[in-house]
């Protein structure tokens, strides 16, 4: 009987710890509307690990990854390894979702998903994969999404590349650092990868 009670208490503690990682009504990495009045020591950029889920546009992925790495961020890459037209959208989504699961297990500081394409056929599996990231307390940024998830609680920001480097764009590394540190930011950010 005592073992059952201890197991029940342990399960309750696990559930509470998971719930504590998810902000109410806000996406992980998008909870601040203003900078705190008291300065704090935040995560140093060399301690930020980025889980980068690739897209079918490997050239664009390479530019983004190189820009992140050039700014001393540690990037782990999950390639979709597609062979072209023979790959179905569902298989591509499943491969990307497996990469997300791997990054949660690796405990990265942020997950970037390049070219996400949420369709009616894969909506539930995307929602589940992104919910798992949310419950782990890891922010998600969508880079050049084709179709983003409807639930905006599943991602902190959309990053759109602006390689013309207009006055409105920021470096992709600066955007990622801002999201990771949970500093105030727009929901859609123009980023430069060059």
Language model features by range: what are they?
Residues 122-140:
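Catalytic-core regions built around general acid/base machinery
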């Amino acid at each position: 009987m005592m073992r059952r009670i201890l197991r029940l208490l342990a399960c309750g503690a696990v559930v509470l710890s998971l719930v504590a990682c998810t902000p109410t009504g806000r996406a992980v990495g998008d909870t601040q509307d203003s900078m705190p009045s008291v300065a704090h020591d935040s995560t140093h950029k060399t301690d930020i690990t980025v889980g980068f889920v690739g897209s079918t546009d490997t050239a664009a992925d390479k530019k983004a990854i190189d820009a992140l790495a050039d700014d001393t961020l540690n990037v782990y890459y999950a390639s979709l390894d597609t062979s072209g037209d023979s790959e179905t959208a569902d298989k591509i989504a499943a491969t990307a979702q497996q990469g997300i699961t791997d990054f949660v297990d690796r405990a990265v500081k942020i997950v970037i998903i390049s070219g996400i394409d949420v369709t009616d056929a894969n909506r539930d599996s995307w929602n589940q994969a992104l919910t798992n990231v949310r419950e782990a307390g890891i922010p998600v940024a969508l880079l050049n999404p084709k179709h983003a998830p409807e639930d905006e609680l599943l991602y902190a920001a959309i990053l759109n590349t602006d390689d013309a480097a207009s006055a409105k764009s920021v470096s992709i590394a600066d955007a990622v650092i801002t999201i990771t540190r949970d500093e105030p930011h727009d929901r859609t950010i123009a980023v430069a990868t060059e």
